[in-house]
Design a protein with these regions (language model features):
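PRPP-associated nucleotide enzymes
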Residues: 1-129, 134-256
């Protein structure tokens, strides 16, 4: 019998098939030359939105269980993530979790305000749902919005990929968020898990991380990365296996 995939493994293949995770020669906004790139703007179909919500829900459920009252999606990329995650939490785990998001500009007519969706209450346990984090900027912008709405307990930040890179100092953005705001960040996968899983593995007949690419990625992390090498998938509850997450080598979109 074939071994079931973890949702982490599924998510890595999902990113590759969706054209979100690519390999080659790229330059980051900070000017770093990187051998891989993650472009979450390439998610664009209903199927992808549905699957993405399931991966976020799996990560959230594994790390926080049912200890969340509301999901907050920072405008703009966080909005569909929070909505799709809340749907998946209900469909997969029976958790009917509230969701809300902010407007970039306050509305001065109708109901007004900067918040849309669930009205946060004092004591609510909130998880922020975001695509990636490369600096603490997004969190710094979120905190006044959330704390201005109610006296909430921000339990976690859930993101798709932890690049495990240093920022301007010696810490990663995730480490800085924990240190400055006391907020735990949970990635669906880390870049080291991506390397471990994809190295020498064919996805639809193509090997994306061969020995040369692995060496380039490890050299990049040696220069800009944080934390130890390694990162095998499947350690602890965050890598649990289960039929709920099986893709069975499904393509990007289901056939009709």
């Amino acid at each position: 019998m074939l071994e079931e995939m973890t949702y982490k493994e599924e998510f890595i293949e999902f990113m590759v098939r969706s054209g979100v995770l690519t390999f080659g020669d790229f330059t980051t906004k900070s000017g770093r030359k990187t051998p891989y790139f993650i472009n979450t703007g390439n998610y664009k179909t209903g199927y992808q939105a549905s699957k993405l919500g399931q991966f976020y829900a799996a990560c959230l459920h594994d790390n926080l269980g049912d200890q969340v009252d509301a999901l907050f999606g920072p405008a703009y990329k966080g909005i569909p993530l929070a909505v799709s995650c809340s749907i998946a939490l209900y469909e997969q785990y029976g958790q009917d979790v509230n969701y809300c998001f902010n407007r970039k500009e306050a509305k001065d007519h109708g109901e007004g305000g900067t918040m849309v969706g669930y009205k946060l209450q004092d004591g609510d346990r909130v998880a922020i749902i975001e695509d990636v984090i490369t600096a603490g900027t997004a969190i710094r912008e979120c905190l006044p919005v959330l704390q201005g709405a109610a006296k909430v307990d921000i339990r976690a930040l859930v993101i798709s990929v932890d690049r495990m890179e240093k920022g301007t100092g010696d810490k990663s953005a995730i480490q800085e968020v924990k240190e400055q705001y006391g907020i735990d960040a949970y990635p669906i996968v880390t870049v080291r898990e991506i390397i471990s899983y994809l190295h020498g593995r064919e996805i639809d007949g193509k090997v994306y991380i061969d020995d040369e690419m692995k060496a380039r990625m490890e050299a990049y992390l040696e220069e800009y990365g944080i934390g130890p090498a390694g990162g095998r998938i499947g350690v602890g509850c965050a890598g649990r296996r289960g039929p709920l997450f099986l893709l069975s080598h499904r393509k990007e979109r289901p056939s009709h």
